[in-house]
Amino acid sequence: MQENLRFASSGDDVKIWDASFLTLVDKFNPHTSPHGISSICWSSNNNFLVTASSSGDKIVVSSCKCKPVPLLELAEGQKQTCVDLNSTSMYLASGGLNNTVNIWDLKSKRLHRSLKDHKCEVTCVAYNWNDCYIASGSLSGEIILHSVTTNTSSTPFGHGSKQPIRHIKYSLFRKSLLGSVSDNGVVTLWDVNSQSSYHTFDSTHKAPASGICFSPVNELLFVTIGLDKRIILYDTSSKKLVKTLVADTPLTAVDFMPDGATLAIGSSRGKIYQYDLRMLKSPVKTISAHKTSVQCIAFQYSTSLTKASLSKGSSNKATAVNKRSVPVSSSSGAAQNSGIVREAPSPSIATVLPQPVTTALGKGSGAAQDEAGLARSKSTDIFSKETDAGKSQDFSSFDDTGKNSLGDMFSPIRDDAVVSKGGDESIGKGDGLDFLPQLNSVFPLRKNAGASSSLVLHSSPLNVLMGSSGKEENESHEPSAESKRAYLGKQEPKDAMKQFTKLISSGAEPGILNTCPSSNQARNLEKFEKPEKDIEAQLIHEPSVNGSSTTVPKAASSVTAGVASSLSEKIVDTLGNSRPGAPLTSVQIRFIQNMIQETLDDFREACHRDIVNLQVEMIKQFHIQLNEMHSLLERYSVNEGLVAEIERLREENKRLRAHF
């Protein structure tokens, strides 16, 4: 197995090149035809190369492990000029001058089947993604789908004899999408399920189109070339031309490198151009490859991706990355859309160029496709601006604001981990949040479960609002044994209230309430008022985002103190009036703790709502200021005098050009 990725080109002979450095590795010619070699394809393990000549003298399978050595010769004298291997490299499809499509069994070295549905010369053949169908195009302008499993052929479809088919190719992602180019320069995308045109690009090439190739990593991108020297990139989703380049010579062959970032294009003058999609103005490298025109270019399959996919057990077939994607399973008689393509696992296409593609796995026949039978795409064009899919539509008006500025400068609330409470509640009480109707669902406030010594951390909405990825911090304090017991024994306030009322009204049993000195009762009350003070202190001195302590205004502090003192008096009065001198039971203790916790939670929610409202209002004002600044800059950046002077100079230049 070769270490470096290679590609083969054919013209007057076959040459194997190092794809990275574009240096010649080997050259050979297993054919005796003076007309050159018209078609080549690699086996899935990159060890063998299949070639066919323009005269159709024979098909040769050569070993390319070390030096190229011809191993097998097929179809001698049968005029086969185009070839394609299936994904297992066990069967070979060929077509040629005798109007037939042949399927060869390479293991037995015999003709497996011969299909005689074409009326004219077959110019190209291609296996589909699961090897169930073979598509073939001919000079009569017809495309026919041959079912390998049922041994039947479809009704011919195409644009007629005025558009002879020169090249066809299946999309690697949209399994039912087939592309074709013809002699009149028309590029057509076909839906093979309905055998109808998905879209036709008329007059894109001013001369015969000679090649088409789909990107192995971008499900939207494909490329065509032609004898008009044009390289045209298309978007299958918007059905538009993305970019057009003009080369120096007529172009005859094209193929994508498996990484999807590099194009190798052959010309009629024997040159091979290497283009980088990230800088398409001119070729990165140019080499003189053949004495005649370059008739075919074929990259090897990515061996690293093949090994990775096989190690995961995703498929029993060898992975053909830049050819087709092998499904996990497929029924032999399934229709061509029986497996859906996994959506591209990588990011959107704007970031996809340097990354290799992973093997797309079929998921079975239940996958959803669009009305034309094509899997819907979530990615964007390779040249498009990357979209932020994680941004909520409600906040789309804030895209221009700074990413981290507001969240770090103005938020006194923690922007890190949240200590959640069992059965947490959302802040559904905020009436002042008309600007963000979904704010309560997007940023739910979570509360502590009852461990009074634990920090209560809140999630600030600002970093989410601005699309930032806030640094997560995990701060947790070990609750004391009393807090743990209180947490385990905690009940809902209503249940605790019922039990407490029942005990008070009916009187406690002798085994439950034991008389103790009044000092014990005072000690217990002091003991359970202490967590309340701790929480109050924690609320006042809650750490801010940057780690420094931010103090809540004194008004909030006084309100907190007033709430706590009134609550304490109410609890003491209630317990003292009910049974003077009796110690607190566990139910009473839980009830008190729940009352304190609920009161503090309500107060905390109110504070949080006020702060969020303030933050939202600040963001609105900043956005208004931003729009005002943009409008003022646009208004005053244009100097009328300079514009008039420029127009005067333009007129003078035109006059001078006309006279001199």
Swiss-Prot record:
<feature type="modified residue" description="Phosphoserine; by PLK1">
    <location>
        <position position="637"/>
    </location>
</feature>
<dbReference type="Pfam" id="PF00400">
    <property type="entry name" value="WD40"/>
</dbReference>
<comment type="function">
    <text>Required for mitosis progression. Promotes the nucleation of microtubules from the spindle. May play an important role during the embryonic development and differentiation of the central nervous system.</text>
</comment>
<keyword id="KW-0131">Cell cycle</keyword>
<keyword id="KW-0853">WD repeat</keyword>
<keyword id="KW-0132">Cell division</keyword>
<feature type="modified residue" description="Phosphoserine; by PLK1">
    <location>
        <position position="397"/>
    </location>
</feature>
<feature type="repeat" description="WD 2">
    <location>
        <begin position="32"/>
        <end position="71"/>
    </location>
</feature>
<keyword id="KW-0498">Mitosis</keyword>
<dbReference type="GO" id="GO:0000242">
    <property type="term" value="C:pericentriolar material"/>
</dbReference>
<dbReference type="GO" id="GO:0005654">
    <property type="term" value="C:nucleoplasm"/>
</dbReference>
<keyword id="KW-0206">Cytoskeleton</keyword>
<dbReference type="GO" id="GO:0031109">
    <property type="term" value="P:microtubule polymerization or depolymerization"/>
</dbReference>
<dbReference type="GO" id="GO:0007019">
    <property type="term" value="P:microtubule depolymerization"/>
</dbReference>
<dbReference type="GO" id="GO:0000931">
    <property type="term" value="C:gamma-tubulin ring complex"/>
</dbReference>
<feature type="modified residue" description="Phosphothreonine; by CDK1">
    <location>
        <position position="550"/>
    </location>
</feature>
<dbReference type="GO" id="GO:0036064">
    <property type="term" value="C:ciliary basal body"/>
</dbReference>
<dbReference type="GO" id="GO:0000922">
    <property type="term" value="C:spindle pole"/>
</dbReference>
<dbReference type="GO" id="GO:0001650">
    <property type="term" value="C:fibrillar center"/>
</dbReference>
<dbReference type="GO" id="GO:0051301">
    <property type="term" value="P:cell division"/>
</dbReference>
<feature type="modified residue" description="Phosphoserine">
    <location>
        <position position="379"/>
    </location>
</feature>
<feature type="repeat" description="WD 3">
    <location>
        <begin position="75"/>
        <end position="114"/>
    </location>
</feature>
<feature type="modified residue" description="Phosphoserine">
    <location>
        <position position="325"/>
    </location>
</feature>
<keyword id="KW-0963">Cytoplasm</keyword>
<feature type="repeat" description="WD 7">
    <location>
        <begin position="246"/>
        <end position="285"/>
    </location>
</feature>
<protein>
    <recommendedName>
        <fullName>Protein NEDD1</fullName>
    </recommendedName>
</protein>
<dbReference type="GO" id="GO:0005737">
    <property type="term" value="C:cytoplasm"/>
</dbReference>
<keyword id="KW-0677">Repeat</keyword>
<feature type="repeat" description="WD 6">
    <location>
        <begin position="204"/>
        <end position="244"/>
    </location>
</feature>
<dbReference type="GO" id="GO:0045177">
    <property type="term" value="C:apical part of cell"/>
</dbReference>
<feature type="modified residue" description="Phosphoserine">
    <location>
        <position position="411"/>
    </location>
</feature>
<keyword id="KW-0597">Phosphoprotein</keyword>
<feature type="repeat" description="WD 5">
    <location>
        <begin position="160"/>
        <end position="200"/>
    </location>
</feature>
<dbReference type="GO" id="GO:0070201">
    <property type="term" value="P:regulation of establishment of protein localization"/>
</dbReference>
<feature type="repeat" description="WD 4">
    <location>
        <begin position="117"/>
        <end position="156"/>
    </location>
</feature>
<dbReference type="InterPro" id="IPR015943">
    <property type="entry name" value="WD40/YVTN_repeat-like_dom_sf"/>
</dbReference>
<dbReference type="GO" id="GO:0005813">
    <property type="term" value="C:centrosome"/>
</dbReference>
<comment type="subunit">
    <text>Interacts with FAM29A. Interacts with HSPA1A and HSPA1B. Interacts with gamma-tubulin in a HSPA1A/B-dependent manner.</text>
</comment>
<feature type="modified residue" description="Phosphoserine; by PLK1">
    <location>
        <position position="426"/>
    </location>
</feature>
<dbReference type="GO" id="GO:0005814">
    <property type="term" value="C:centriole"/>
</dbReference>
<feature type="repeat" description="WD 1">
    <location>
        <begin position="1"/>
        <end position="31"/>
    </location>
</feature>
<feature type="repeat" description="WD 8">
    <location>
        <begin position="289"/>
        <end position="332"/>
    </location>
</feature>
